[in-house]
């Protein structure tokens, strides 16, 4: 499920931020976390980023396919493309007047 990799990633972010801030102070951690990119096994390219403008996690592996109840469990897996996701997000924000 999503919560397991998301929580593991959150711990990785906090660990890296504490190292960079040399502190566990919440305000210092928040400053370091903003825009931070870390190495992560769940990243599409081996990294994930805490986007600076809205603190959204981006760059994680995403994909889809047909699920089945036996191995390989997912047929015709297609990897998501973050370039396309960012383009669609920008179009949506513009259509809603957010940009």
What do the predicted segments below correspond to?
Residues 1-99:
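Extracytosolic ligand-binding ectodomains
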């Amino acid at each position: 499920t999503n919560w397991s990799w998301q929580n593991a990633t959150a711990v990785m972010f906090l660990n890296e931020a504490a190292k960079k801030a040399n502190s566990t102070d919440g305000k210092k951690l928040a400053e370091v976390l903003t825009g931070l990119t870390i190495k992560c096994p769940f990243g599409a390219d081996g990294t994930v980023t805490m986007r600076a403008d809205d603190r959204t996690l981006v760059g994680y592996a995403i994909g889809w396919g047909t699920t089945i109840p036996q191995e390989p469990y997912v047929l015709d897996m297609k990897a998501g493309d973050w370039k396309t996701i960012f383009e669609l997000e920008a179009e949506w924000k513009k259509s809603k007047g957010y940009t």
